[in-house]
């Protein structure tokens, strides 16, 4: 079952199981720095919970009145149904696409991982809130940000939202 180097061989058949040490602590970080993004949206990390398996991050954002007015001037008051009923736009309609594509990066904008795994990244965006899930890292840089990835090795730091400092 073991290779010469002491690691497990890949099984030929069957399933793989493991035991998770649930005694490992969950580290909770809150009240991240509020930043104003290039489109005028204010955003901050409300909480980040680092578990032995995943990092769960909740971002709060606020759309300015000027952004709302500009969006409605360009797009109308809301979605219009065939019967004429209007469902008003809310903040999730007005926030730019940036909110859907944030990933973890270091202070230089380098992504912590080359690619996101299945089920990682944005887990949902609502009016004023966005949730993200990432795989746990054994070691994080001194400062970690959420930012939209622009290339294989870079992110647009103008849109970076700092995570609360890790201790």
Regions found by a protein language model. Give the residues of each.
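Alpha-helical, hydrophobic structural elements that either
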Residues: 1-167
């Amino acid at each position: 079952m073991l290779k010469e180097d002491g690691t497990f061989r890949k099984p030929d058949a069957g399933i793989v199981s493991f035991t998770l040490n649930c005694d490992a602590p969950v580290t909770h970080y809150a009240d991240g720095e509020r930043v104003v993004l290039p489109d005028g949206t204010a955003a901050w990390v409300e909480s980040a919970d680092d578990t032995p398996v995943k990092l769960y991050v909740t971002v709060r954002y606020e759309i300015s009145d000027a952004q709302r007015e500009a969006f409605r001037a360009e797009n109308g008051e809301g979605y219009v149904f065939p019967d004429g009923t209007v469902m008003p736009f809310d903040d999730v309609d007005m926030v730019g696409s940036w909110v859907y594509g944030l990933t973890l990066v270091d202070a230089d904008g380098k992504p912590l991982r080359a690619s996101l795994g299945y089920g990682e990244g944005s887990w949902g965006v609502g009016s004023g809130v966005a949730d993200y899930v990432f795989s746990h890292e054994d070691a994080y840089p001194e400062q970690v940000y959420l930012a939209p990835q622009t290339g294989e090795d870079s992110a647009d730091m103008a849109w970076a939202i700092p995570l609360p400092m890790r201790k």
